[in-house]
């Protein structure tokens, strides 16, 4: 069993145990109607968009620096981030829906609920907590599940980042005709990362979609290496959480898009 299989099994058990029903009862409704969409920001700029992530740990990291997360989110916005990603998995990533709820109130930026979605109730909880965007990982869903969850999320006026890791998954994603596709440079089965993976996967990408390179971006050189693939944005977590001066680091990542 891979780490990804283990995480997905854990999510299914949480569903059976009523974890998400309880969250729907205890979370307060958050109004985010004033927030702009992430897609509108992708539409309006010739620079790479940055989804800046809040994370505490992962299966490959014991612990990240202990930050004032409310301030971190404000610093992300002040230094040019276009959206914020917040991990809500408690067991493997040290996040929570309560954290998402607290932090979405600290920013005018749209917030991505970063989790392993396998059921509509998880989308309900993300929406109630104040997410503007949800993540669907192609690898853990059948085509029918993906279609059902995508349509359900968009019916709730949520944006969807559809995540792929290989060319086969990219072709499956295209069937949905999603607006935004993320290419994860991290193999979620083995949790190994290669930042140039984006270039390989998008060699023959189709037009009419926005593409986000996710994971493994450490510096401006990494961005320069992947921007040639024709991406529209980046999702960055660990490097930003470790950074001691976001005002120097984050704006430098927003290179001009390369049209292919």
From Swiss-Prot:
Pathway: Amino-acid biosynthesis; L-tryptophan biosynthesis; L-tryptophan from chorismate: step 4/5. Coiled coil: none annotated. It is an enzyme of class 4 (lyase). GO terms for biological process: L-tryptophan biosynthetic process. InterPro entries: Aldolase_TIM, Indole-3-glycerol_P_synth, Indole-3-glycerol_P_synth_dom, Indole-3-GlycerolPSynthase_CS, RibuloseP-bd_barrel. It catalyses: 1-(2-carboxyphenylamino)-1-deoxy-D-ribulose 5-phosphate + H(+) = (1S,2R)-1-C-(indol-3-yl)glycerol 3-phosphate + CO2 + H2O. GO terms for molecular function: indole-3-glycerol-phosphate synthase activity; phosphoribosylanthranilate isomerase activity. It comes from the Bacteria. Keywords: Amino-acid biosynthesis, Aromatic amino acid biosynthesis, Decarboxylase, Lyase, Tryptophan biosynthesis. It holds the Pfam family IGPS. PROSITE patterns: IGPS (PS00614). Its EC number is 4.1.1.48. NCBIfam families: PRK00278.1-3 (NF001371). Belongs to the TrpC family. This is Indole-3-glycerol phosphate synthase.
């Amino acid at each position: 069993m891979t780490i990804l299989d283990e995480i997905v099994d854990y999510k299914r058990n949480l569903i059976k145990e009523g974890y998400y029903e309880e969250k729907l009862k205890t979370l307060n409704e958050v109004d985010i109607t004033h927030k702009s969409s992430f897609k509108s920001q992708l539409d309006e700029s010739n620079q790479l968009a940055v989804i800046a992530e809040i994370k505490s740990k992962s299966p490959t990291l014991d612990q990240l620096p202990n930050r004032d997360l409310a301030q971190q989110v404000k610093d992300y916005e002040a230094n040019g981030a276009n959206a914020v990603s917040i991990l809500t998995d408690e067991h493997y990533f040290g996040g929570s829906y309560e954290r998402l709820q607290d932090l979405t109130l600290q920013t005018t930026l749209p917030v991505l609920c970063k989790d392993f979605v396998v059921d509509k109730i998880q989308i309900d909880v993300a929406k109630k907590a104040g997410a503007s965007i949800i993540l669907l990982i192609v690898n853990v869903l059948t085509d029918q599940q993906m279609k059902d969850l995508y349509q359900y999320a968009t019916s709730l006026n949520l944006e969807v980042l559809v995540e792929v890791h290989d060319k086969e998954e990219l072709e499956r994603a295209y069937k949905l005709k999603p607006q935004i596709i993320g290419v994860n440079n991290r193999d979620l089965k083995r949790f190994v990362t290669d930042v140039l993976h984006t270039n390989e996967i998008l060699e023959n990408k189709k037009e009419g979609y926005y593409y986000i390179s996710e994971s493994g971006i450490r510096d401006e050189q990494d961005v320069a290496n992947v921007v040639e693939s024709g991406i529209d944005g980046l999702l960055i977590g660990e490097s930003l959480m470790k950074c001691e001066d976001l005002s120097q680091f984050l704006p430098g990542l927003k290179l001009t898009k390369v049209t292919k």
